[in-house]
């Protein structure tokens, strides 16, 4: 096999070197069908059904199309590329001319990828990092609170109570049942946080990013 051509199905042309030879849509289907089954004898009826779908064609349509394809191949070879089998059909000869079939799928995929990139711009890495960090901080915060509450239950001799400081909007959790000078006496004035205090004097303040002992 010494020659190679490109069958462009999208443009209905047979490309030989720098030259382009126009084919009809039916001739493109015909050449593709014969080439993909190279070496097989395909009957007239099968070729007509496959390459002229849903159409009533004249008896001369198939031989005329075969002749046109042969004329194009004679630009590069004198060998018989498509052989006629009388009263049987036609066969594309193996090891004659290599055909690369271009159905335009590569171009379509390229356009599709470009459209996807245009419609869905990349999310900034920095923004993604901040979102992940925020999620981890919240998870860490919740885990710490649960651990501290469990510790209160384990070591506290009194019942645990909780209430909201109306001045700071902070949640106070404590097992100190005797509250001198008001329920928030001795506690730091920290807004929008969660404050834990036990009867040993331990005070832990948690916000959405960290927990720290006072």
Swiss-Prot record:
CDD domains: trans_reg_C (cd00383). Residues 1-94 bind DNA. SMART domains: Trans_reg_C. The keyword Signal applies. Keywords: DNA-binding, Signal, Transcription, Transcription regulation. One of its GO terms (molecular function) is DNA binding. The keyword Transcription regulation applies. This is Protein PsaE. It comes from Yersinia pestis.
